[in-house]
Amino acid sequence: MEAPIRNPFTVLIDSAESQPWTFDGLRADADKGDAPLHVPYEFANLGRFPDSLGDYSIAGLVGHVAVERKSLEDVWSTILGWTTDYQVERGINGRRERFKRELQNLAAIPAGIVVVEAPLERCILRMPGADGLNYNEDSHEGSNEQRGKHTVRENRKIFFRSVVSWQERYRVNWFFCGSRRAAEVFAFRYLEKAWEHYLERLTPRERKQFRGAIA
């Protein structure tokens, strides 16, 4: 059995995450023998609306790097303003406006992105609507009333134009990945690069102090 290599930083996962990534099955770079990579993670409060700072960060770098995770159902309901059973139970309203505030928060930090667990094509082509097209994969449930009053065609326009507009307005990049696993790997590699680039900007003394502070 190959001995795993411990990742040099700890991933912080927001304690409100309902389906968290745990970064299992990753491997180190070739210069480290392509060994299995053990990624330590901890659950933490990364902020609550209106001060939320994404779903994932790095210990010691909260407020510097953040990844906002969106499942397919979540990105639909957020952009189109639908109310899911989960949100009704928790009294969460106005998801679209709340998310715009979250994007403002991401834009204010050096490295903040949105990662979606589905490709853009799937988000568009499988769009439900009030005129009869229902999405019934995975755990998606809910009435057409919860999904809004717009037709599929209208929903597609609203969704696509919102994604384009919000990226231009808030300067926060969105990455639509081919699957949940692809999104998980992408998010980790983004955090990894943000960690490396942060350390590169420190002097040797500052780097030593920083590593000691988060050990």
Enumerate the language-model features and the residues they cover.
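Non-catalytic C-terminal interaction segments of nucleic acid-processing enzymes
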Residues: 1-63, 76-215
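Conserved catalytic cores of phosphodiester-cleaving nucleases, focusing on short active-site segments
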Residues: 65-71
